[in-house]
């Protein structure tokens, strides 16, 4: 089971999701998308919360209002963190999550520590948590199938882009050749005209 929330504080709305337990977190880690941003309470146990960003955006493009929604949701889903003030939330792109065979279920590391960001959360804001909870949906998605569908769509888009680029290049080559042919034809016509003038007769005295 995966819990989905909608952050509608900006337009278009953003999807936030998290697993029910550490076992589902394993699948979320495995089948995350490049557009996903992972959130967790720093140094405390908490839910693994993911924010799905629009394609073509990065972690630096997260709207401030959406970021606040995410960290409040993470804090609220930490047994210890929800009762504490002044905690830190870490977040990083899904692609930066590292999972090795010797790690426990639900445990992760990072490929590059410099890509991990930290935001301080002073206290729980009930209005935000309640608003998000009203959008909560329980689903049983086929994460592997969704990931494959997403990747297939991306491959098709890249294939179409490559084909379009090749088409443009072919048209440019054709246009360049046509310009060269026109240039050569013009030069030839000019040369023929000059030859005709040089061979002409100016006198009417002829036999």
From Swiss-Prot:
Principal location class: membrane
Topological domains annotated Cytoplasmic: 122-207
Compositional bias of kind Polar residues: 184-198
Extracellular topology ranges: 1-104
Transmembrane stretches, start-end: 105-121
GO MF entries: DNA binding
Coiled-coil intervals, chain numbering: 112-189
GO terms for biological process, alphabetical: positive regulation of cell motility
Similarity comment text for this entry: Belongs to the CCDC25 family.
Role this protein plays: Transmembrane receptor that senses neutrophil extracellular traps (NETs) and triggers the ILK-PARVB pathway to enhance cell motility. NETs are mainly composed of DNA fibers and are released by neutrophils to bind pathogens during inflammation. Specifically binds NETs on its extracellular region, in particular the 8-OHdG-enriched DNA present in NETs, and recruits ILK, initiating the ILK-PARVB cascade to induce cytoskeleton rearrangement and directional migration of cells.
Subunit-level organization: Interacts (via cytoplasmic region) with ILK.
Designated name of the protein: Coiled-coil domain-containing protein 25
Gene this chain is encoded by: ccdc25
């Amino acid at each position: 089971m995966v819990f989905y929330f909608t952050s509608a504080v900006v337009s278009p709305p953003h999807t936030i999701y998290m697993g029910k337990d550490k076992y589902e977190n394993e699948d979320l880690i495995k089948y995350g998308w490049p557009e996903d941003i992972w959130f967790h309470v720093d140094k405390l146990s908490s839910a693994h919360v993911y924010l799905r960003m629009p394609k073509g955006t990065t972690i630096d493009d997260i709207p401030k209002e959406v970021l606040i929604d995410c960290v409040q949701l993470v804090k609220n889903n930490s047994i210890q963190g929800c009762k504490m003030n002044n905690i830190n939330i870490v977040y990083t792109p899904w692609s930066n999550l590292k999972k090795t065979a010797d790690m426990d279920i639900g445990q992760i590391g990072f490929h590059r520590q410099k890509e991990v960001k930290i935001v301080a959360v002073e206290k729980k804001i009930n209005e935000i948590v309640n608003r998000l909870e009203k959008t909560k949906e329980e689903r049983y998605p086929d994460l592997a199938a969704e990931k494959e569908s997403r990747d297939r769509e991306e491959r098709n888009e890249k294939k179409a882009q490559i084909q379009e680029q090749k088409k443009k290049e072919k048209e440019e080559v054709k246009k360049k050749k046509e310009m060269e042919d026109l240039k050569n034809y013009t030069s030839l016509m000019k040369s023929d005209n000059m030859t005709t003038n040089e061979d002409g007769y100016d006198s009417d005295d002829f036999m």
